């Protein structure tokens, strides 16, 4: 049974049991900033389990793509060396949100695994574990399912504390938690290992294939376990593991999904040993890298981007170990698309952009490896002992982008170890500096409890009647807010838009009987809108009647920019290509900022075409239409989703100019495109590998930018005594004149320097047969300084010459030593000596070197010290 068939069978089975099939969410969690990557099927349902999100269904099933590399769940180091560790895997899951519980969950799992209609795994090949205190689950397995008691294993608190067990799951130190039951497959006596709970449980004979979690309790801060009013179920089964069972192989790398990738990796690396562990690493890593790039992650030196960079570079290094020194990793994307493109069409859509990102990173890594190895080899040559200092490790990472695990690989090959304590200390210092210089946004709902949900009416209203449902101060629930206090007010109904989809939250006021609250920002927390601000007068209590009033001018200006962003996105795709996808945005009342995927700077003529296309749509004054529908219908309309945004069952489709722009969006917009008035692109830049950024303004601000440009043009024309129409000709004429003057000045300086150099010949001091000369000259450029040095050196014969010149408070140094004197004194050493005394640095070859410095006052003494220094060197 092929992996794709198992995936589809699982989803069909649970659909037959009343579950809604839910598509895999992005690998970048949209609802949990504490997670680097989606690492389990339940992540996209976390808010549902917490009661902060409502769905139209109470049962769900999914095949969720997951990554475990970096953070708490990190399998990277084990990948390729074990049969079952992966950076990327698919998690098959079924979920109950206060619907069915233990009995149905256990019976569903057993039926799917063992019934002839589905997987038909022999029951004698399976055993199960339950939490030691979970008599209910034990009884269901023994009495309802009929599993022999000798194959039901109770697992207690085996991790050092109460409820710390392989069979007890918790979302965190507090919150939803409960026992779990796990199903294990016996690969047979020929494989070493024992049953769960035995000393040999870490062997590979008994492998967990399905974990069924019962969210039964809510753990409080003091450790009290209170039963949840609506117990839920969260299950997970690794597709790769169950595929190994169904395909009668022991290692996940032997299943159909991996065999094609291993063959492609062997061809790309020209590896002769088809069983090499490095091929496993490469085959695994192409999956995680391709899906991460498809989900908007790009290589960088921090966060998710750095984890991606580590995975790419680890794969490339394993290719190098197999003898492949040319870029190869990006060529494997085609094989992956062939294997998984049908299940994940986004791979097909993004194939070209994924290949370009990986190829660019391979090229960058080749340069990094070359530079980093020079630094590392230099450090190793001076190493005393077997421990590479933390400072070296940190410099390699921080300055050269050299991953620590790569340094560790090289160290291991040379039987060396790393000073990780020293590295960690330096890294913590850097993080501290970043924290001190950075800014952050307060999580106002971190510890608060907010009941109910806010009804948003802001699409059609800017004011209305409401009641206060909660008040928060410093993240804690309070009953009253007094004059002058800052805090958060939650209403049952609001016209205030909460920040999401790149659009800033609304501002304005909330008016009460005898009180007024200034809304400085509006954020979303689950199903509630948090009005953040300060009480200007009076006092407010929970339950008070309120009249929220949105600042209409700010809302309208924001709407102009948001609608313009949609038109800009569409124009970018039409001009640059379909590979362009949104990578982020910021829309407020002042401007719009749009980040998108593209692999080179946008050419000026392309920017002009894009801007013109958007303005054409604005002039057409097309209606802006919204429609509510399900996700499937939206996708059929060709609607594009926003990066990093999560969507419910019902989505809002926004169309402009007919089919010109169709996107999913919950933001506020204009009624017709003509309301935007005008767009003006103010900048285009690169912010990361493969990501560009456009900033623009609309409406009156666009007119202001155009007026300012015209004012600057007129002022420049007046200054240069030309008309605006003839300004370019005038500037070109002045540039030509300036070039001619510079040539004349350079010739005069060279002539002056030449005559001065002749006068200095007599000032050279003979030291053991070497004529040494050190001089400082005024206002000579670097080229003239080199010419002077060459002339002096040639006329002096066996000599060592160093010259210095000051220009714009910066000192230039140049030194030359005749070939017959380099065994006694070196130009690089001369420059280093003087540069060290003037707050600079320098170096070069034995016969020629350059440098510089900034301490102009110290220069005379530094030049004066050269003779004594040279005597000490030459002897």
From Swiss-Prot:
Q: How is the cofactor bound?
A: Binds 1 zinc ion per subunit.
Q: What is its main location?
A: cytoplasm
Which annotated residues bind Zn(2+)?
562, 566, 665, 669
Q: One GO CC term of this entry?
A: cytosol
One GO term under biological process is: alanyl-tRNA aminoacylation
Under InterPro entries, the record lists:
aa-tRNA-synth_II/BPL/LPL, Ala-tRNA-lgiase_IIc, Ala-tRNA-ligase_IIc_anticod-bd, Ala-tRNA-synth_IIc_core, Ala-tRNA-synth_IIc_N, Ala-tRNA_ligase, Ala_tRNA_ligase_euk/bac, DHHA1_dom
Transmembrane regions: none
Q: Which cofactor does it need?
A: Zn(2+)
Keyword annotations from UniProtKB, A to Z: Aminoacyl-tRNA synthetase, ATP-binding, Cytoplasm, Ligase, Metal-binding, Nucleotide-binding, Protein biosynthesis, RNA-binding, tRNA-binding, Zinc
Question: EC no.?
Answer: 6.1.1.7
Q: Which reaction does it catalyse?
A: tRNA(Ala) + L-alanine + ATP = L-alanyl-tRNA(Ala) + AMP + diphosphate
Quote the subcellular location field of this record.
Cytoplasm
Which Gene3D superfamilies does this chain map to? 2.40.30.130, 3.10.310.40, 3.30.54.20, 6.10.250.550, Bira Bifunctional Protein, Domain 2, Threonyl-trna Synthetase, Chain A, domain 2
Q: Listed GO molecular functions?
A: alanine-tRNA ligase activity; aminoacyl-tRNA deacylase activity; ATP binding; tRNA binding; zinc ion binding
Q: Which family does it belong to?
A: Belongs to the class-II aminoacyl-tRNA synthetase family.
Which PANTHER family does this chain map to?
Answer: ALANINE--TRNA LIGASE, CYTOPLASMIC (PTHR11777:SF9), ALANYL-TRNA SYNTHETASE (PTHR11777)
HAMAP family per the record? Ala_tRNA_synth_B
Q: Which NCBIfam families match?
A: alaS (TIGR00344)
**Domain comment?**
Consists of three domains; the N-terminal catalytic domain, the editing domain and the C-terminal C-Ala domain. The editing domain removes incorrectly charged amino acids, while the C-Ala domain, along with tRNA(Ala), serves as a bridge to cooperatively bring together the editing and aminoacylation centers thus stimulating deacylation of misacylated tRNAs.
Give a short account of what the protein does: Catalyzes the attachment of alanine to tRNA(Ala) in a two-step reaction: alanine is first activated by ATP to form Ala-AMP and then transferred to the acceptor end of tRNA(Ala). Also edits incorrectly charged Ser-tRNA(Ala) and Gly-tRNA(Ala) via its editing domain.
The protein's name: Alanine--tRNA ligase
Recorded source organism is Saccharophagus degradans (strain 2-40 / ATCC 43961 / DSM 17024)
Q: What is the lineage of its organism?
A: Bacteria, Pseudomonadati, Pseudomonadota, Gammaproteobacteria, Cellvibrionales
